[in-house]
């Protein structure tokens, strides 16, 4: 179980800290989308957490 949490932590850190390294700057016409694009790497984590909430709702059948 510790390995799963370590992997999640590594993925979150790499998504948060290396986003400036892998991606360039948006063109000026799309500058208003910067807050949304900064948030996008975290969205798959919400789907992962939603799976646990869903399973808890159906009593982990």
UniProtKB/Swiss-Prot annotation:
Keyword Hydrolase attached:
no
Where do the TM regions start and end? 36-56
**Annotated Pfam families:** PsbK (PF02533)
Subunit structure of this entry? Answer: PSII is composed of 1 copy each of membrane proteins PsbA, PsbB, PsbC, PsbD, PsbE, PsbF, PsbH, PsbI, PsbJ, PsbK, PsbL, PsbM, PsbT, PsbX, PsbY, PsbZ, Psb30/Ycf12, at least 3 peripheral proteins of the oxygen-evolving complex and a large number of cofactors. It forms dimeric complexes.
Under what name is this protein listed?
Photosystem II reaction center protein K
Alphabetically list the UniProt keywords: Chloroplast, Membrane, Photosynthesis, Photosystem II, Plastid, Reaction center, Thylakoid, Transmembrane, Transmembrane helix
Q: Which family does it belong to?
A: Belongs to the PsbK family.
Annotated Gene Ontology cellular components are:
chloroplast thylakoid membrane; photosystem II reaction center
The pro-peptide lies at 1-24
Any one biological process term the GO annotation gives: photosynthesis
Q: How does it sit in the membrane?
A: Single-pass membrane protein
Q: List the InterPro entries.
A: PSII_PsbK, PSII_PsbK_sf
Q: What does this protein do?
A: One of the components of the core complex of photosystem II (PSII). PSII is a light-driven water:plastoquinone oxidoreductase that uses light energy to abstract electrons from H(2)O, generating O(2) and a proton gradient subsequently used for ATP formation. It consists of a core antenna complex that captures photons, and an electron transfer chain that converts photonic excitation into a charge separation.
List locations, semicolon-separated: Plastid, Chloroplast thylakoid membrane
Q: Does the keyword Transmembrane helix apply?
A: yes
Question: HAMAP family recorded for this chain?
Answer: PSII_PsbK
């Amino acid at each position: 179980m510790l390995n799963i949490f370590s992997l999640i932590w590594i993925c979150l850190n790499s998504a948060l800290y290396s986003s400036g390294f892998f991606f360039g700057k948006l063109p000026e016409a799309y500058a208003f989308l910067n807050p949304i694009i900064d948030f996008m790497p975290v969205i798959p984590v919400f789907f992962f957490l939603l799976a646990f909430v869903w399973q808890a709702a159906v009593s982990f059948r």
